[in-house]
Amino acid sequence: MVAQGFTQIEGLDFGKIYAPVARLESIHILLAYVTHHDLKLYQMDVKSAFLNGPISELVYVEQPPGFEDPKFPNHVYKLHKVLYGLKQAPRAWYECLKEFLLRKDFEIGKADPTLFTRKVDKDIFV
């Protein structure tokens, strides 16, 4: 299911939508550090990232064609989490990820709010 974010109106359907992205300088420094110290670097991708963030605004969507509830064909669905296509999806995902990493004792970078680090013994998680 994909929301029709193009129909959303700023100030009415959504407020803050800015979501920080990794600074290129942070990526360069990380890669230089890994290369200099001959370390292994692992990368991950969260495929359903935009489906995990809780939504703070009230958003209703129509029932998708072919999936209408036969008892209530004219009803709409109230969203509890963001969907692909909503303007607030990137920010909701960032906030969800940030809260999770902070609970796991990661620290937010001072110059880059997308840089989270955690040191455990000799290991550094970035």
Language model feature labels by segment:
Residues M1-V126:
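Long, low-complexity, charge-biased intrinsically disordered regions
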